[in-house]
């Protein structure tokens, strides 16, 4: 049994937007409580992945147990559960909030409240968490704590009279934060005597011990010798070890209600111990699992192909290894006439897709071609069936389908009101439907739109940042499917369909997108010795075309004057050769062409 009674345990997390200083504040808390010695300290201590440190974002959750001597002379155990701040990982955030009783709301004193922070704060309020506002970066010259306090009160309705000003960089205000966690965050409920239930809020794959599961004991207790049952996956395991994160793993014999720890039980893959699952004892199982469990559903799909065909087995192995530690990643083999063998992969969102791609290239030294991201469409066929399509190239022909439904999201954009026009223009270009506009303060506004997800996953985020000089932030969630006039746009290169360039677009946009595609390809595909026609088509109808002219060899150079029939004979021979070359010739599309098409702005 660990040494802390339930009334002296505090479980809390930090809610903050990207770049508002969450990981730095976590570092200071670890340092101030003596959990990490100063000499071992490195920046962003809880962000273990190299990629996390580099991008300055938290991808996987971490947890740390700190001991703190409070003003009343008692020693308290503070469990800090770190959360990712990005919209792609909102399910992970909701699970880690369920494991806490309180939250520090960290807001940059020079920037104010951002969209993703708000989404997480509302989630925290739904879970009845005690929220402590913290104004970070008050040492910056542009800091305006009073304005930010007003903003938090206006937007969230939180009383900010006792908000804590701090600077995570210099350590100012950190002792006050620790004391207020003890004073204001309620202790966990004393449910040691009830049947054992523990919530999995994170897990990672260790090549030697299998999956390490991070959990919070909600009721009862878990000890090292127990046999446990995971209620959602219905799998049973014998525990090898149980322990706490301080922040390095440290074995203990038992953890009771209210405590946060880890367990190892030779679990093969992260998919067997999913985030949100309930752990209970095999011989005395709980009646019902903890509420809120949901399977991770991929929202964005794309094809991943190795640039060299012989790297295919390496890519397969790398994806299998990544899947051991990332249960949200889905993939299946796919072949394409233009690209050879590869995989169709599903991701939570664009950031998740970029991270997986970057990890494959960085950790496994693979060179990849990525096709344009697409979403899942519901296709109603003429025979009454309904199928799901995640690859535009597999969409049935127009004669076979009745209608196509695409996923829609409700989006809230927070921005200074100078950029209203630019943002409304962007949303309209992306087929957005205006719902509402609210002024939060005199300077800031919230725009609420409903948009097709397909319009968001291309480059909406980049465009939003560009048009608002980086000031806007957004948050969105899926609201269901709607029927739309959608068509499959194919690209034909030398009369052959190039599958990876196939997209599904709205009929009204098809011409502009098709024209943009063929023009872009004309710039990027190198000239051959024969003419290459480039066409964009909907079904059998060509809607845009251009061609790359041939490189000509001057066959008349050696004729100097002479008989005209001799020249004609040579030109005829050349034309015949070109005709044969055109029939036999294969056009190699360079990788830049695929990449440029991804970047092609889809706005008309």
UniProtKB/Swiss-Prot annotation:
Keywords: Cell inner membrane, Cell membrane, GTP-binding, Hydrolase, Membrane, Nucleotide-binding, Protein biosynthesis
Bilayer disposition of the protein: Peripheral membrane protein
All copies of domain tr-type G, residue ranges: 7-189
GO CC terms, sorted: plasma membrane
GO molecular function, one term: GTP binding
Enzyme Commission number(s) from the entry: 3.6.5.n1
NCBIfam families: lepA (TIGR01393), small_GTP (TIGR00231)
Protein name: Elongation factor 4
Source organism of this protein record: Synechococcus sp. (strain CC9311)
């Amino acid at each position: 049994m660990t040494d802390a009674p339930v009334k002296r345990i505090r479980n809390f997390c930090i809610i903050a937007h990207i770049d508002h200083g969450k990981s730095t504040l976590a570092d200071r808390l670890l340092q101030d409580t003596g959990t990490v010695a100063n000499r071992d300290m490195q920046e962003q201590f809880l962000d273990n992945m190299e990629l996390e440190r580099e991008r300055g974002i938290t991808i996987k959750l971490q947890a740390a147990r700190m001991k703190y001597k409070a003003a009343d002379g008692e020693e308290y155990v503070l469990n800090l559960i770190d959360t990712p701040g990005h919209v792609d990982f909102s399910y992970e955030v909701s699970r880690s909030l369920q494991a806490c009783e309180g939250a520090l709301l960290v807001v940059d004193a020079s920037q104010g409240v951002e969209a993703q922070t708000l989404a997480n704060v509302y989630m925290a309020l739904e879970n009845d968490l005690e929220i402590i506002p913290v104004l970070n970066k008050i040492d910056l010259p542009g800091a305006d704590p009073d304005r930010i306090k007003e903003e938090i009160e206006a937007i969230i309705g939180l009383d900010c009279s006792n908000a804590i000003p701090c600077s995570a960089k210099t350590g100012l205000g950190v002792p006050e934060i620790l004391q207020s966690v003890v004073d204001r965050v309620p202790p966990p409920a004393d449910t040691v005597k009830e049947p054992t239930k523990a919530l999995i809020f994170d897990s990672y794959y260790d090549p030697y011990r299998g999956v390490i599961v991070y959990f919070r004991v909600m009721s009862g207790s878990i000890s090292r010798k127990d046999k446990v049952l995971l209620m959602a996956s219905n799998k049973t395991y014998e525990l090898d070890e149980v322990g706490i994160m301080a922040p390095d793993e440290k074995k203990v014999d038992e953890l009771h209600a209210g405590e946060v720890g880890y367990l190892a039980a030779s679990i093969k893959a992260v998919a067997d111990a999913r985030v949100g699952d309930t752990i209970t004892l095999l011989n005395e199982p709980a009646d019902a699992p903890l509420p809120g469990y949901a399977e991770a559903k991929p929202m964005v799909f794309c094809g991943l192909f190795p640039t060299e065909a012989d790297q295919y087995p390496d890519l397969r192995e790398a994806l299998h290894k990544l899947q051991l530690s990332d249960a949200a990643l889905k993939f299946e083999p796919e072949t394409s006439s233009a690209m050879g063998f590869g995989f169709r992969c599903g991701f939570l969102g664009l950031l998740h897709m970029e991270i997986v791609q970057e990890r494959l290239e960085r950790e496994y030294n693979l060179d990849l071609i990525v096709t344009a991201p697409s979403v899942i469409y519901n296709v109603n066929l003429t025979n009454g069936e309904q199928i799901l399509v995640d690859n535009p190239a597999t969409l049935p022909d127009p004669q076979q389908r009745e209608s196509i439904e695409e996923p829609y999201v409700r989006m809230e954009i927070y921005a200074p009101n100078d950029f209203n026009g630019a943002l409304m223009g962007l949303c309209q270009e992306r087929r957005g439907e205006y719902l509402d506009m609210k002024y939060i303060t005199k300077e800031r506004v919230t725009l609420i739109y409903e948009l097709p997800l397909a319009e968001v996953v291309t480059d909406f985020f980049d465009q939003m940042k560009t048009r608002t000089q980086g000031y806007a932030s957004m948050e969105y969630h899926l609201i269901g499917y709607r029927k739309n006039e959608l068509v499959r746009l194919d690209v034909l290169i030398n009369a052959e369909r190039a599958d990876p360039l196939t997209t599904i677009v709205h009929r009204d946009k098809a011409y502009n997108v098709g024209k943009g595609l063929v023009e872009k390809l004309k710039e990027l595909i190198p000239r051959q010795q024969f003419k290459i026609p480039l066409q964009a088509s909907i079904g059998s109808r060509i809607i845009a075309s251009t061609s790359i002219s041939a490189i000509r060899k001057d066959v008349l150079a050696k004729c100097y004057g002479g008989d005209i029939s001799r020249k004609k004979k040579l030109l005829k021979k050349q034309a015949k050769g070109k005709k044969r070359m055109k029939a036999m010739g294969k056009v190699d599309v360079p990788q830049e062409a695929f990449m440029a098409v991804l970047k092609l702005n889809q706005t008309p």
